[in-house]
């Protein structure tokens, strides 16, 4: 099942199975059709049903409007899964380089392969690929657009500052 939803970062496409959310993407510059074709192509054997009522709970949980667990169903190579799991351990408000992420997963010479796995992350925002930058500190190569990446990082930094100030 899939459905379009509003998010703090613009329209997003959510994809879910009976076991959990397996895709989240933001509208590409080419529009909704291109976004849907790009994201839904990952499940070429699946019978896809447009059902935004079924994906709405995932959207609410992903963007903090509703509490509760957010079950993820990730499909990838063992290496990709390892990278995506490492992404979920990067604290909100923080960024790491591809090189540091490669070191973190025990593959210090695999920064390019890590970058490739980050780029194929099917669940944007929830698996926070936006928290990875070049070793030079430059924020580049975000599938959903560099402006959106800057907004995601700025929002997280602001939330982190607010929460830190409250302590």
Model-derived features: where do they sit?
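Basic nucleic-acid-binding alpha-helical/helix-turn surface characteristic of O6-alkylguanine DNA
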Residues: 1-109, 155-167
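Helix-turn-helix DNA-binding helix
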Residues: 111-114
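Short cysteine clusters
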Residues: 129
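Major-groove DNA-recognition helix of helix-turn-helix-type DNA-binding domains
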Residues: 120-122, 126
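…primarily DNA-binding HTH/wHTH and HhH modules…
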Residues: 135-167
